[in-house]
């Protein structure tokens, strides 16, 4: 191997580094591949340096001969650029090769860009413990409740270039599930897009409740719901916010999966209905009241289809909501009304008055049509008691009036307080319910044996967020 071959290899190596830098600037998923290229290039450089030492020992006078004047018509600046880009030259042409110092500088630059991309994403998470005592569970009463690990979660948020990223994965005791995962882009100061699994824009956002247990609307799928599609957030000025969204399906296309965070229609047994092709429109007016605070009032519309796997036919579903969300000093007041309806195309013999929904690994039946009313009140506190720096006390009330045959009203009320202490956030909730799922009921809106009975649950959730 002569010096001509050596400098050509160094030139090709320099061109590969240039290509890697250009490619790294374009796509984030290639960072791992680029790091591998860096390691390969470093190995080649070490080998070439060893060979160079051998050649120098064999050369007379210790100096290498200068390259001859190129005679090929491809010579000159254009050809040198081609060599730098990694193109192969004729054996008779010996372009200027990058020095080891220059190559090290290119590698260092590439690693810096990769580190910048990695540091643009911020990682966090939470570990939560939960204590529960239930008066409708004899075992729970005999044990005086149960205390266990409730959740471990990891989330990532940040920006890479002009693209926003946000994702969260959760592990519960009996299942794991995606919470959300989307990429976003701001077209301008007014319009932002989220593509992926995002929060459905419906009713009071981000939550129509204050406690850990959420409001009754959560268990109907109308609070903190996440589906897969595209959402646009439009803020033409400080007085208005609009949402426009299309969701192809829930966060999981597998409708038989009960292990999920959001409540959706799920399939099982003779209930084979699933959600598809959903449109959402939401508008909210922000009012500033002198001497009092702020008042947000809004309207929401949700329209979609219900696909039945048995009949292969599509039914309709819709929901409309009006809401008010007021913040007067340390007080927050929420008022919301919802009307919803599912019109499934079931086979003969399957009751159309109830549909099967589910999450947290449990399916249940809910009334296919009804009105929902929420009245919530909370007060925030700033305190200085050891590590405790703040908190709130609240009462969240939900009344569900089904509009189908053989049904009964469902009620849920949550009274509690939350405490903030550094990275620790704790909820202390007393939940009471009648004919309400997850509070001793057989479902929501069902006229079952437990319909007229009030049930209670004490729930304490302590989470460390990092």
How does the language model describe each region?
Residues 110-253, 284-291, 374, 407, ...:
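Outer membrane beta-barrel
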Residues 140, 253-274, 309-311, 343-365, ...:
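Solvent-exposed loop segments that connect transmembrane elements
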Residues 7-16:
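Bacterial N-terminal signal peptides
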Residues 118-124, 153, 162-164, 192, ...:
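Outer-membrane beta-barrel architecture
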Residues 420-466:
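Predominantly the C-terminal beta-signal and adjacent terminal strand-loop region
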Residues 22-128, 466:
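N-terminal periplasmic/intermembrane-space "pro-region" immediately following the signal or transit peptide
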Residues 281-403, 411, 452, 456, ...:
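Detector for outer-membrane/organellar transmembrane beta-barrel domains
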């Amino acid at each position: 191997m002569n010096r001509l071959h050596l400098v050509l290899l160094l030139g090709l190596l320099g061109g590969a580094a240039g290509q890697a830098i250009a490619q790294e600037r374009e796509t984030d998923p290639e960072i791992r591949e680029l790091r591998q290229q860096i390691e390969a290039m470093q190995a080649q450089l070490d080998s070439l340096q060893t060979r160079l030492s051998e050649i120098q020992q064999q050369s007379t006078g210790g100096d290498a001969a200068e390259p001859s004047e190129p005679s090929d018509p491809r010579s000159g600046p254009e050809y040198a650029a081609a060599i730098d880009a990694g193109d192969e030259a004729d054996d008779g042409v010996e372009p200027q090769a990058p020095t080891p110092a220059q190559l090290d500088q290119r590698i260092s630059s590439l690693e810096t860009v990769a580190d910048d991309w990695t540091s643009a994403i911020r990682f966090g998470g939470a570990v939560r413990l939960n204590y529960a005592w239930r008066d409708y569970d004899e075992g729970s009463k005999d044990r005086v409740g149960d205390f266990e690990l409730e959740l471990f979660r990891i989330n990532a948020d940040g920006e890479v270039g002009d693209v926003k990223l946000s994702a969260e994965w959760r592990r519960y005791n009996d299942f794991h599930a995606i919470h959300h995962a989307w990429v976003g882009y701001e077209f301008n100061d007014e319009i932002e897009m989220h593509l992926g699994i995002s929060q459905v824009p419906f009713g009071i956002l981000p939550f129509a409740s204050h406690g850990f247990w959420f409001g009754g609307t959560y268990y109907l799928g109308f609070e903190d719901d996440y589906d897969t599609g595209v959402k646009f957030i439009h803020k033409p000025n400080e007085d208005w916010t609009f949402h426009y969204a299309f969701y192809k399906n829930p966060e999981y296309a597998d409708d038989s999966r009960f292990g999920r965070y959001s409540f959706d229609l799920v399939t099982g047994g003779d209930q084979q209905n699933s959600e598809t092709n959903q449109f959402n429109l939401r508008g909210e007016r922000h009012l500033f009241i002198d001497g009092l605070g702020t008042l947000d009032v809004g309207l929401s519309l949700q329209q979609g289809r219900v696909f039945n796997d048995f009949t292969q036919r599509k039914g309709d579903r819709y929901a409309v909501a009006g809401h008010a969300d007021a913040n007067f000093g340390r007080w927050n007041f929420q008022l919301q009304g919802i009307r919803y309806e599912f019109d499934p195309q079931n086979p003969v013999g399957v009751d159309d008055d109830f549909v099967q929904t589910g999450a947290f690994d449990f399916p249940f039946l809910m009334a296919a049509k009804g009105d929902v009313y929420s009245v919530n009140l909370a007060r925030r506190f700033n305190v200085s008691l050891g590590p405790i720096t703040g908190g709130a006390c609240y009462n969240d009330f939900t009344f569900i009036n089904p509009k189908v045959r053989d049904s009964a009203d469902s009620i849920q009320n949550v009274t509690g307080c939350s405490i903030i202490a550094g990275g620790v956030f704790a909820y202390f909730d007393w939940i009471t319910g009648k004919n309400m799922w997850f509070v001793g009921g057989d479902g929501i809106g069902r006229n079952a044996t437990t319909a007229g009975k009030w049930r209670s649950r004490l729930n304490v959730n302590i989470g460390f967020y990092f």
